[in-house]
């Protein structure tokens, strides 16, 4: 039997997509490399993906990036939109064994998540995004791989620092499993 998405997850996808757009539009640091910024939306995507799972993470990445592109540029850059969905899915799977909802975010969780997110960012932004740019848009390889390398490094650092801090902060607001006792 198929599991249906909860109302909570659907609402999280909508709100998460909106926040992704806002962060992607207004909380970025320009790099000097064309159409490539230091993004704060991916650390947020990491948090949402870990909390709500890979399907929600993928949809937040897809919807959020699509809306961001249309509101910023007037058109969508589908190769990178697809990659935002893929990285959201990867973040969600990377967080499967973590229990942020019950206040658990151990050093082991941090290390394991950051190894997975670094590997995911390398594959997605360093290989898939540039390859799709070449296949879909016939972009010059040197340009798109330069963008890909910078996006890879900046996303690894941003998710590693800001994403980890967001997850730690979120976990610290949750009640730890077994911490409450009946009087």
UniProtKB/Swiss-Prot annotation:
It comes from the Bacteria. InterPro entries: ECF_substrate-spec-like, UPF0397. HAMAP family: UPF0397. Signal peptide: none annotated. It is a multi-pass membrane protein. It comes from Enterococcus faecalis (strain ATCC 700802 / V583). Coiled coil: none annotated. Its main location: membrane. Keywords: Cell membrane, Membrane, Transmembrane, Transmembrane helix. It is found in: Cell membrane. The chain crosses the membrane at residues 10-30, 44-64, 74-94, 115-135, 147-167. GO terms for cellular component: plasma membrane. Belongs to the UPF0397 family. This is UPF0397 protein EF_2154.
């Amino acid at each position: 039997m198929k599991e249906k998405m909860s109302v909570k997850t659907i609402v999280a996808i909508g709100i998460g997509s909106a926040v992704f757009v806002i962060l992607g539009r207004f909380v970025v640091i320009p790099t000097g490399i064309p159409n490539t910024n230091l993004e704060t939306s991916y650390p947020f995507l990491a948090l949402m993906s870990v909390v709500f799972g890979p399907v929600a993470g993928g949809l937040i990445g897809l919807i959020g990036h699509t809306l961001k592109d249309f509101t910023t540029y007037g058109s969508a850059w589908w190769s990178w939109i697809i990659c935002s969905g893929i990285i959201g899915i990867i973040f969600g799977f990377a967080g499967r064994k973590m229990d942020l909802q019950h206040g658990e975010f151990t050093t082991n969780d941090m290390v394991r998540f950051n190894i997975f997110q670094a590997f995911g960012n390398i594959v997605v932004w360093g290989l898939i995004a540039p390859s799709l740019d070449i296949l879909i848009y016939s972009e010059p390889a040197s340009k798109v791989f330069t963008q890909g390398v910078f996006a890879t490094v900046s996303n690894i650092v941003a998710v590693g620092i800001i994403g980890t801090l967001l997850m730690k902060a979120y976990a610290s607001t949750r009640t730890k499993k077994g911490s409450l006792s009946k009087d």
